[in-house]
Amino acid sequence: MPVKIPDNLPAAEILESENIFVMSETRAANQDIRPMKVLILNLMPNKIETETQLLRLLGNTPLQVDVDLLRIHDKVSKHTSIDHMNNFYRDFEAVRHKNYDGLIITGAPLGQIEFEEVTYWDHIREIIDWSQHHVTSVLFLCWAAHAALYHLYGLQRKLLSAKRSGVFNHQRTHKHFPLLRGFDDEFFAPHSRFAEMEVADLKAHKELQVLAESDEAGAYLVLSRNNRNLFVMGHPEYQKSTLKDEYQRDLAEGLNPRVPKNYFRGDDPSQAPVARWHGHGSLLVSNWLNYYVYQLTPYDLHDMSAITPWEHEYKDAEDND
């Protein structure tokens, strides 16, 4: 099924050229279908690139998705025109009174800044708190996952000595969760961050479950016990060239970055990158949208008390094979 996006959104042309099913608001208005309403809080500098990456994943799911784009403030962006922001993005005050089936909060290039020193930290906290009462399921990506784990559960992240960049192998630590249906025992996912959450701290917290982790990159998929919050420590949405673009940007800025691991063919930055995570990324978002949004959300979004939780067996079933 398609993802419904605003008429004339630039991402539409790119996605249609990739054979991703998108639908304009005008066409969708003529269909009598209850779409999943998903809000995206886009904190990345290049808004259009991130929109396209996320819409690409949402457009590959079997559900019709109605997307609203949210901005954290109305300040001028260095990488995105003010016209684009005003035309396609909403301020929080415009959606505060609404309920949504799903919310995606993206990463942000703030990995070395203390949370309380982020200029819009109070806004982030407010939106996270709001989401716990107005959204069926929230998907936090990378920096947003760290920020939410800190705000909701008081967990501290650990700064790394160097940026962790690359494509890393991960293992499932459970098998009986709907989120992991169709997953291989091992799979790849990109990471690009300056901090990590300690796996031991996450596993010790009674309200959290670590579903996948990496020997090199640490925890990757963490789910709250109430199945309402999914924390993804990497970037399953990244396109093939994203890590290369970040690496070349850091080189140009004189930051002496490490070559992203397991990314360029032969780990040689003069060679083309190898994308080996797109299948996993699509399956992850599809499973989240189906099992943790569509299957749990009330038909009438005005009544969030009607959210249907998963049975207990899905919460604690260990992979004992």
From Swiss-Prot:
It is an enzyme of class 2 (transferase). It catalyses: L-homoserine + succinyl-CoA = O-succinyl-L-homoserine + CoA. Keywords: Acyltransferase, Amino-acid biosynthesis, Cytoplasm, Methionine biosynthesis, Transferase. GO terms for molecular function: homoserine O-acetyltransferase activity; homoserine O-succinyltransferase activity. Pathway: Amino-acid biosynthesis; L-methionine biosynthesis via de novo pathway; O-succinyl-L-homoserine from L-homoserine: step 1/1. GO terms for cellular component: cytoplasm. It is found in: Cytoplasm. Substrate binds at residues 163, 192, 249. One of its GO terms (biological process) is L-methionine biosynthetic process from homoserine via O-succinyl-L-homoserine and cystathionine. Its EC number is 2.3.1.46. Transfers a succinyl group from succinyl-CoA to L-homoserine, forming succinyl-L-homoserine. NCBIfam families: metA. This is Homoserine O-succinyltransferase. It comes from Shewanella loihica (strain ATCC BAA-1088 / PV-4). The gene is metAS.
